[in-house]
Amino acid sequence: RDDIAHVAAIKAALGDRAAVRVDVNMAWSEGEAAWGMAALADAGCELVEQPVAQVAALMRLVRRFPVALMADESLTGPESAFEIARVQGADVFAVKLEQSGGAFNALRVAAIADAAGIGLYGGTMLEGAVGTAISAHAFSTFANLQWGTELFGPLLLTEEIQTEPLDYSEFELTVPNGPGLGVTLDEDRVAFFARDGIRKTISLPGGKV
């Protein structure tokens, strides 16, 4: 209840300047989710991500509340996407390349969502520059990306392993347009960060390395 009150306070402060979405990460039981989704809808939250783990519970919840329900952890590839779509268990799919089983399977997940009238969101697992570039290329091919994307993984890193950083500006990521993925690795930086047995990380008392 405290968490939902906190979300409600944030939304009240933001007003119409920004939308609010909540990721529950499967932390609720179905009963808790029923109460929580109703309260979040009343607070003005526009989307709740994976409130429960079970697809059957998602199916029941999505029919009860006006707030959009997004499937995330339940999506592990085309087969799970088809099952969720078959039972109408979500309003939105969070498509993640690794979780889907690779870029081609992510495209299949998106195609299933489109066919079922389910919205798409381009998810992230906090990939570095290479994984983010692959995600950007894949998501740019989606016919619809109604719920946007947030490929911010590289922005959390303090070191680069490519010769040129990805182009972030004005809250947008430009899809790399060079050969292949559009990313060129800095071989010296890759060698520096390699953990191949030659250079080892040793933890010493006091936290010194």
Can you say where each PLM-predicted feature lies in the sequence?
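Electropositive phosphate-/nucleotide-binding environments in soluble metabolic enzymes
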Residues: 4, 30, 55, 103, ...
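Conserved hydrophobic beta-strand within the GNAT/NAT acetyltransferase core sheet
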Residues: 20-24, 71, 122
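Short, exposed beta-strand "edge-strand" segments with a Pro/Gly-rich flavor and a Y/T-containing core
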Residues: 26-28, 48, 66, 70-76, ...
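Alpha-helix termini
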Residues: 36, 57, 130, 136, ...
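Shared catalytic-loop signature of beta/alpha-barrel
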Residues: 44, 53-70, 76-172, 176
